[in-house]
């Protein structure tokens, strides 16, 4: 699961998992307000213990005033599937985003799951090898977020090595 971001009329970016790097890049290179809810382990464990895993992200977002100006960026291999009980927390965040009118974008694989089914803009990484779906997907996700944040319309601050001449 990745993030929610305030991007000019689009609100905060939130991230979990490998998307933490995306949140860092959005903040550092693009000056976007972006968050990684699972970076606060104390709050995460308190929420899991008291509320359950499936609602950890959505309840965290509610405290962050999640609204229709926000965009949820999902990085997931399967995109969430309630029937198979896989990444139900992602499904719940996507459901809430759609309910309040926030945008849902993502990079997923396989059939894309619930994220692909209802998302506003979702890329599906093609399966090159059924034995390497997860590493290929996560590798492509990193390429895609780096291409996104380095786009001239989004990147306002230079990367380190490019800034040294």
Model-derived regions: residue spans:
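Glycine-rich, small/polar surface segments that engage phosphate groups of diverse ligands
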Residues: 1-67, 71
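Generic structural signal for well-ordered, non-membrane alpha-helical segments
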Residues: 15-19, 50, 54, 86, ...
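C-terminal binding/interaction regions
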Residues: 63, 68-125
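A generic structural signal for short coil/turn motifs at secondary-structure boundaries
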Residues: 45-46, 81-84, 132-135
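Short alpha-helices
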Residues: 16, 99, 108-165
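Alpha-helical scaffold segments in soluble metabolic enzymes
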Residues: 21, 25, 56, 60, ...
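Residue-identity detector for glycine
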Residues: 3, 8-9, 17-20, 30, ...
